[in-house]
Amino acid sequence: MSKESQLEALVAACHWIGAKGWAPATGGNMSLREDARWCWLSESGKDKGSLTTDDFLQVDIATNLAPSGRKPSAETGLHTLIYRLFPEANCVLHVHTVNATVLSRVEKSDALHLSGYEMQKSLAGQITHLDDVPVAIFDNDQDIDALAERIARHHRQFPLRYGFLLRGHGLTCWGSDVAVARRHLEGLEFLFECEMQRRLLERA
């Protein structure tokens, strides 16, 4: 699929995310890899439910700079980190869902462990509900460079897959193309909803 087609697919995914209420108040950011050097990242302060292809800025993966001079999203450094860590990643979605935001605060360990859910198989490479699927949780930080370094350091010891949570902030996930990243987002959000309900019912 051409870059233009993939960017149109990403815009459609952004509209879907906006309709779900998963990126409220202009929150969240989305990107698409162009090649080894460049990616296209949503511009800061834009409502994700009404983005167009013109709202994506070309960004240098190595430097985080946008040649246009326009301001890319605040978490640019996390998107470019993922593209550097995962050559197979071609789309990154960062959302602020209620489930991801709350679960990342309730879970006090450094990972949310998912097991026993059939929908784990929505994640690439997962073939059984019996596996333990850890989703790493990192403390939120306004210093994105420092946060990116912590994530990279963690990945060197405990390789990341699919996505990670920022505590009290949201979910960042990725995939080999827009469709896979979107499936990972939808699958993880479903699993987070199940986990929220399970914890609430167990406390009742």
From Swiss-Prot:
Record bears the keyword Amino-acid biosynthesis: yes
A biological process term (GO) from this entry: pentose catabolic process
SMART domains the UniProt entry points to: Aldolase_II
Molecular-function annotations in GO: aldehyde-lyase activity; methylthioribulose 1-phosphate dehydratase activity; zinc ion binding
Keyword set, alphabetical order: Amino-acid biosynthesis, Lyase, Metal-binding, Methionine biosynthesis, Zinc
Coiled coil: none
EC number: 4.2.1.109
Broad enzyme group: lyase
Gene3D superfamilies per record: Class II aldolase/adducin N-terminal domain (3.40.225.10)
Binding residue positions for Zn(2+): H94, H96
A Pfam family it matches: Aldolase_II
Manner of cofactor binding, per the entry note: Binds 1 zinc ion per subunit.
Segments crossing the lipid bilayer: none
Cellular component, GO annotation: cytosol
Cofactor(s) named in the record: Zn(2+)
Pathway the protein contributes to: Amino-acid biosynthesis; L-methionine biosynthesis via salvage pathway; L-methionine from S-methyl-5-thio-alpha-D-ribose 1-phosphate: step 2/6
Reactions that this protein is recorded to catalyse: 5-(methylsulfanyl)-D-ribulose 1-phosphate = 5-methylsulfanyl-2,3-dioxopentyl phosphate + H2O
Role this protein plays: Catalyzes the dehydration of methylthioribulose-1-phosphate (MTRu-1-P) into 2,3-diketo-5-methylthiopentyl-1-phosphate (DK-MTP-1-P).
Family, per entry: Belongs to the aldolase class II family. MtnB subfamily.
Protein name, per record: Methylthioribulose-1-phosphate dehydratase
Lineage of source species: Bacteria, Pseudomonadati, Pseudomonadota, Gammaproteobacteria, Enterobacterales
